[in-house]
Amino acid sequence: MIARIWSGESPLWRLLLPLSWLYGLVSGAIRLSYKLGFKRAWRAPVPVVVVGNLTAGGNGKTPVVIWLVEKLQQRGVRVGVVSRGYGGKAAAYPLLLTPETTTAEAGDEPVLIYQRTGAPVAVAPERAAAVKAILAAHNLQIIITDDGLQHYRLARDIEIVVIDGVRRFGNGWWLPAGPMRERASRLKTVDAAIVNGGVARAGEIPMQLAPGLAVNLRTGARCDVAQLSNIVAMAGIGHPPRFFATLEACGAHPQKCVPLADHQTLAPADVQALVGEGQTLVMTEKDAVKCRAFAEDNWWFLPVDARLSGEQPDKLLEHITSLVR
């Protein structure tokens, strides 16, 4: 229902316009207060790169963060990541991730980024606190903040926006009548706009999510996902249909697709109940970090990597590395 409202297919968005105007006024006032100097943002002693969205919902932001971390690591840059840790609840903040940190404590995306890249990761509702903690523990040259484009209390040197190339900005309205956290005109002020799927427009960086081999949660064995049979597909991400479409494009045709809420807590019994006798469960990598502790033999995940095309990605990386002292 919410997807139909935000796309404009359902006329119900009109009923939510008063709340959207209120959201827009408040969010605009907050940004303006920092722009005019009434409020002061905290500036870190190292460059900060924000990777965020203008819209709510899954746009492919986490794969972009992983891509950026790995590219900077390849250039010898010491990079760390901070996040709000949405979906997790730690005993105390800021929380520096370790191999023992769970998604219940830190949230699924920070744990995924930590496991995939090996980079230091810290979470806290107040991102400045996370930055201070991670810099106290590690000698880093640059910080990437996973989400937080609208978190103006933390000053930033580079802003990168990730856009869903198929859904774009829906009906163009602020939350809750539409998907917008800020108006599309905000794109004029960011350093780069990366478009996940669809058709990138002038000045935007095209990106595709490239699937790898399916990985068994228990053994780490790998195989072509099309070789798996009797598949039940599960996706607890911002836009589950994208994952199901990826499976189809890989030649894997699920018998059943189970969309879950983004950041949803997954109880072992609930996940186990999805799979019948002789069936194979295939999930996203973000779901896998929550399920690995209680995984069964026939559970697999399909990793995806961001593939950015054209000359602009290299120019963006050169711009970012030029800030490193």
UniProtKB/Swiss-Prot annotation:
Enzyme superclass (EC): transferase
EC number: 2.7.1.130
BP terms from Gene Ontology: lipid A biosynthetic process; lipopolysaccharide core region biosynthetic process
Reactions that this protein is recorded to catalyse: a lipid A disaccharide + ATP = a lipid IVA + ADP + H(+)
Gene Ontology MF annotations: ATP binding; tetraacyldisaccharide 4'-kinase activity
Recorded metabolic or biological pathway in which this protein acts: Glycolipid biosynthesis; lipid IV(A) biosynthesis; lipid IV(A) from (3R)-3-hydroxytetradecanoyl-[acyl-carrier-protein] and UDP-N-acetyl-alpha-D-glucosamine: step 6/6
Gene Ontology cellular component list: plasma membrane
Keywords, sorted A to Z: ATP-binding, Kinase, Lipid A biosynthesis, Lipid biosynthesis, Lipid metabolism, Nucleotide-binding, Transferase
Family to which the UniProt record says this protein belongs: Belongs to the LpxK family.
NCBIfam families listed in its UniProt record: lpxK (TIGR00682)
UniProt name for this protein: Tetraacyldisaccharide 4'-kinase
